[in-house]
Amino acid sequence: MLKKLQIVSLAAAVFASPLALADEPALALTFKDPSLKWGPCPEFIPKGCEIAVVHGDPSKPNVDVFFKVPGGFAIPEHTHTSAERMVLVSGTLEVTYQGQASTRLKTGSYAYGPPKRPHKATCANGAPCVLFIAFEEPLDAMPAPGAVK
C-alpha cells in the first residue's frame, strides 16, 4: 500500500508541473498591434528608433522585443551583453558584425548575433525596418568602444 501511495505521489508531482506552466497565456501578435507600447531606444541611437517589449521583463533574462527604425536609418555600432536571435519582419537591413562581411537581411531573414560582438546596421530607403529580437540575458545596448557618437 505504501509503495502504491509513493507511486501515485510521484506521478502527481510529475504531471502537476506542466499544469502550472499552463497558467501562462499564449501570445500572438504583429508589430502593428495597437496594444504594443513603443518607446525610445538608448540615447546613443539617433531619434527615430523605437522599441516595444513583446514578452518578458527587460531587466530579466529571456526578453523578446520589436525594434523599429525608419527607412534610410543608420544604427550606430554597439554591443549587447546577450546573444541576439533576430527575424526581420519588415524592410531590408544591412548588418555588419565586426570582423565579418556585411549581410543584407530581407523580410523573413533570421540572424544570430553573438554576445558582446560589435555591430552596426542600415535600413534601406523606403519601408521601415522592424526586427523581432529574442535576448537571452537582460536587455542592454552600449556604444561599441571607439564608435563614432
What are these regions (language model features)?
Residues 63-80, 114-116:
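Conserved short histidine dyad/triad with adjacent acidic residue
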Residues 1-9:
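Bacterial N-terminal signal peptides that target proteins for export
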Residues 16-18:
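N-terminal signal peptide c-region/cleavage motif recognized by signal peptidases
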Residues 21-63, 146-149:
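A short, N-terminal "cap"/entry segment at the start of jelly-roll beta-barrel domains
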